[in-house]
Amino acid sequence: MGIREDWNDKILIFDGGMGSLLQGAGLKPGELPETWNIKHPEVLVKIHEDYLNAGANIILSNTFGANRLKYNETAEFNLDEIVDAAMKNARTAVEHCGRGYVALDLGPTGRLLKPMGDLDFEEAVSIYTEVVKAGVRGGADLILIETMSDTYELKAAVLAAKENSDLPIFATTIFDGKGKLLTGGTPKSVVALLEGLGVDALGINCGLGPVQMKPIVEELLRYASIPVVVNPNAGLPRSEGGKTVYDIDPPEFVEEMKGMLEMGVSAVGGCCGTTPEHIRLLAEMCKGRTRKPIEPKNDTLITSYASVVEMGTDPVIIGERINPTGKSKFKQALRDHNLEYILREAITQQENGAAVLDVNVGLPEIDEVAMMREVVQELQAVTELPLQIDTTDTEAMEQALRIYNGKALINSVNGKQEVMDAVFPLVKHYGGTVVALTIDEEGIPATADGRMAIARKICAEAEKYGIQKKDIVIDALCMTISSEPTGALVTLETVRRVRQELGCNTILGVSNISFGLPQREIVNSNFFTMAMQSGLTAAIINPNSAAMMRSYYSYRALAALDEHCGDYIEQAARLAIPKAGVGGASGAGAAGSAGSGAPAAGAAGASGSADIGSQASGPEHQLTVSVERGLKEQAASAAGELLKTMDSLTVINSCMIPALDKVGKGFEAGTVFLPQLLMSAEAAKSAFEVIKNQMESSGEAGEKKDKIVLATVKGDIHDIGKNIVKVLLENYSYDVLDLGKDVAPESIVEETIKNHVRLVGLSALMTTTVPSMEETIKQLRKEAPWAKVMVGGAVLTQEYADMIGADAYCRDAMASVNYAQQVLV
């Protein structure tokens, strides 16, 4: 009997921490924990047995850091040897105890994926595939993907597990105290992604204790329709005598976990700092308990890496402008591979009110598959809005869905059997919400009854694949009233009936209604209002159209979707709407915080589009805006123009630094996410390169700032955080000496002394490597007492940083920049 069959109404119990027990058994600072699978197998077998005897149902293989990046041809042991030994040790413990399941443990690679980092998505899938195959060969009963801080890497690991095994897949992520992943994801976005990918259970582990996890767990349970797993740390860490200890004892830990079960959690265990005693008391508490029934949720969620759009009562605006149909400039941009043009269209639509962006790059003379894949990646680097993948080419659709970081809206499927046969397997494999067109082999029915019949057929076929109605959005189809006088009425009737009879969400390409008519925006905007009143939940429109956006905000105010008419008032102020008529300003500004489908606050003025690319704005403004929005080519071009009339330092201090500061403050406030922060830094870097070349050719003296040493400490290969800090510090003109990862204390001290560095930054992700960080600080205090030390990493807190002797705890990259500005004066 497998774990799926055995679970039923049981509460599953995972084991607890591994690293702290290995430290207690003699693991040295900087020593790789996975090597003990081979060097000290008896220790691993004993730890596994202790957890099983304590009452754990599931033990984790000691493979958290096992991947080819760490165990390559230069390592003491290769990857297969490490995983084979780990699985053998775990299986031996299960045989000795006569019970239990072995989970193949997959941890993060320690690298950021492109476009934020340098690791290709398919390479990440390949890295995890190697471990999965070895784990399956070694007898794993399930796969646990844990401690993931990036939804993109999480997706790569899940795909590797799905495509190379039929084992149950559990996936847990590591959130910060504000309920965010490193790359900006929320519990809601994680649930949408993982349920779409079809994992068996999802949850949270590490980083926080059970008290700090509670609000995050509540959010996971609010949206999850599958079991939720919670594996907290034993509270918050501190250092005592060179070892990491935690502030919650086993009885207190179990009392907090009791509350988790009452909330509806289905599986519990421990992470850093928990021991067999924690698990023993946890198992005793769980005796006689059954897990609460899981209530299926009916939320239609579309996500990016960070943002979630929920379809329902509040209409969703889908920007239509990234589409070559009828757009000669867009077609030429595709032919010329001018991606910046496409990115500007995206940013303009976001600022003018779009909540989702349609992406269509179909042009006969280009490679649509390659272009779609590239455009999706580039768009996700500059905007956090979810995307609608719009293509009839199933290969392009699959490539886009595979590379997409989130749960996409897919446009589209229809009632033709061959189309359903091609599209539904992709929706099932990659997850997504699919637009369903009410057309089949016979064409578009002239009646609402005919379109409803197709909608029902599509829903029935989708059910065969396990695709629920909540992930189907019905398009009732707009027929132009110039040729079909009753077309609008049929469409509106179909929209109403879909909502009432099927309970599905609805979508329309609104502007089709007016094709061939004069003053189309008048017809479009009035039909848009009628459609929203009929139950339309999403509209593909031009958000740069003032008439359409006025209809949108007016409807929301009238339908009591806009509390105190706040969004309408803000939008009216942006546009200075005349008292009568639809004339006047041609733009549309986004309004402030609204319902789940309403756009986020924007900054476009009455011109109807952002200032990007505007001939009216000068190069100074262009440079500032380009840096803020991560447009590399435009930033470089604007910098070059400014240097014709301005000296280099003025360009840097008047344009570049204020823009970086603005983005940094947005990141600290949670309104800007990590990909945007990094792309802003990349845009600044491209402008700096132009400025640097100008300075070298003219002999102009540049601004020199202090050297800073950065390193990930001995034994730790996870240098994502350190690399992010490096990018930002360099953009603030600091000279960063990046020593890399797995760096010995002696090497850090040597570089600090040799360059008389006044600030050292140390990073660690794993609890087992924090003692190495503490040792590094001790050596710096002795050999380079003038140097300040800032520390960061998922396992650290302010108290912990104080205890190991650091001068500053920096919770994120901007905090590191701020501290550098304080001490390096």
Regions found by a protein language model. Name each.
Residues 1-475, 479-825:
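Domain-level signal for soluble alpha/beta catalytic cores
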